[in-house]
């Protein structure tokens, strides 16, 4: 049985990564994210911290926040900001944060062994 397989990821279109780039959702408050995303309509913060596009009084766990994240994500795809790779791939990535480097691997994984 195959345990991992490649997949066709959604990634920023060529030349658009700088527009999409955003810090992890859990390192900024909603106010900081709102400020950082100001004037950056394609920042991924509009997905990962979608409350920044709603009234500041809304709870960040409100269903409206998740609906806004979905809508923003779909808009990024529809506008060609995020595009799906043509062929299935395995992905290696590296994150650097505050002097710490983490390297990861992304693939489709079977959960059958855990069922």
Where are these regions (language model features)?
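A cross-family signal for N-terminal binding/gating loops and helix N-caps
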Residues: 1-114
């Amino acid at each position: 049985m195959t345990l991992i397989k490649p997949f066709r990821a959604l990634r920023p279109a060529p030349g658009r990564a700088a527009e999409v780039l955003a810090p992890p959702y859990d390192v900024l408050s909603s106010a900081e994210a709102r400020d950082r995303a100001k004037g950056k309509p394609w920042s991924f913060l509009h997905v990962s911290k979608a409350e920044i596009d709603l009234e500041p009084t809304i709870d960040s766990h409100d269903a409206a926040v998740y609906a806004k994240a979905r809508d923003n994500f779909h808009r990024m795809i529809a506008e060609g900001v995020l595009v799906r790779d043509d062929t299935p791939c395995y992905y290696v990535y590296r994150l650097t944060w505050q002097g710490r480097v983490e390297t990861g691997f992304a693939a489709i994984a079977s959960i059958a062994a855990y069922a």
